[in-house]
Amino acid sequence: MPTDYHHGARVIEINTGTRPIRTIATAIIGMVCTGSDADVAAFPLDKAVLLTDVRTAIGKAGTLGTLAKSLKAIVDQCDPLVVVVRVADGEGADPQAIADDQTSKVIGTVTGGAYTGMQALLAAQAQLGVKPRILGVPGLDNQEVATAMIPIAQKLRAMGYAYADGCESASEAILYRDEFGARELMIIWPDFVAWNTDTSASEPAFAVARALGLRAKKLRSIPHQLDCGDPYLGSRYV
């Protein structure tokens, strides 16, 4: 048997903060979000950033876009290491053009060695020393984004989570799921409802963000168990 074969979970240690942080290597989240009012120093555009204290990072995430909502959803489940790539809002002359531009910015590209959008997750290990293994783009994961997530998940040996975009029933969600054949992608449906303290009202909450947090929680505690049947904290079903 090779001497370098590893049995069990791998643990990584981050020593860049005031105290070392140890975590299961497979429990690291990689996420792409928008947030036009986020702190640009804490969340630069199209650059992977490692969050070792998600609760503190929420204070720099602003209130617009998907960033703050996604971080809050994750921290409701646990407080894992999260690699975040913030992308700019979509632009265009009409709603369809804006949506298309947003999709392009989320999927990203590699030009002259510069990684943007989801592609920036591929550079996380070289830049940050960690490899995200739980991937998602809460609130922005249409079919094109979900499709583009698959090869990234395969390269990172990760699991991607995406919403059943546009589906209004369980039967539609099942048909949507069947359009993807990759084992690295899990389709989530429906979204939840959660209280927004900024608006003092209930609103739809990203199920994918909660799935990311729950998966990290499970991998840090009982990694061989499935996610199904576990409660999502901080939200309720519609």
Where are the regions that the model predicts?
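A glycine- and small-residue-enriched flexible loop/hinge signal that marks low-structured segments
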Residues: 2-24, 28-56, 72-79, 87, ...
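Membrane helical hairpin/interfacial module
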Residues: 64-68, 80-84
